[in-house]
Amino acid sequence: DMDLIVSMEGFNGNVRTYIEDTFEPNEIFHNGNAYSFDYKELQIDFITVSPEDYGSNYHYLAFNDLGNFIGRIAQSMGLKYGQEGLWYNHFHNDQKVGKIMISKDYPKIFDFLGLNYARWIEGFDSLEDIFEYIIQSPNFDSEMYEMKNLNKINRERNLKRKSYMSFLDYIAENAPNITGPDHNKPKILKEASIFFECNVFTEIKRFEYHDAERAYASAKFNGGMVMDKYGLKGQALGVAMKNFKGLVISHMGITESYHQY
């Protein structure tokens, strides 16, 4: 198959129609920002992205499963690495309340994760070259890739990926007992904020403020109160809540934040 990263800059048409007119496929499967179709017995995956995410998608998707392997290193450090770059998911009161972008500067990202960006630029001739590249990171840990240490979604996804399973075999044969550093994740986050010159902790406070604001608003007015007082349930309850919110915003001049009301 072939993956094509397509920048949507300057394109205002319908992607499905463009594919139908240009490639005349038998079938098109659409999932999120990806369109999969057949062309001359080859499966094509059109991955449509905004111009600002073109480079980050290229870096993540290049060289087979390498981006996935790098993502596990970032995860061990309390960060996320994917098709949008490097970021941090902040949890407050056991719930995710915000996503904080850290960087799209790949030489710096690779440096921070303990990877050689110049070597990445050279490219890789084989899966074994990719495997060895990951193992050489000082943040590599043999256990972090084991199925038992993945969540259900990643476990099910990676079981279907031949390159991931080959990597597990390679680790078992060549690097079975490498233990990576025991990262102090709050310390790593502080180091990242300095290294990338980003306002991580300001954003954390902003997300926590808005989370507290939502909790306060919910304590004042929520679906349970409406259900108890008026006996509404299901769809009727949802409509009533939506209409009340619309009334507050449109007729009472509360435009900045419904939760402030």
Task: Indicate where each model-derived feature is located.
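Metal-dependent nucleotidyltransferase catalytic core
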Residues: 6-49
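Catalytic cores of NTP-dependent nucleotidyl/adenyl transfer enzymes across multiple folds
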Residues: 38-231
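Charged/polar, solvent-exposed surface patches and flexible loops
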Residues: 17, 21, 72, 76, ...
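Extended, charge-rich intrinsically disordered regulatory tails
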Residues: 217-261
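Alpha-helix capping and helix-coil boundary motifs
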Residues: 7-15, 105, 126, 233-236, ...
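Polar/charged alpha-helical tracts
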Residues: 17, 21, 169, 173, ...
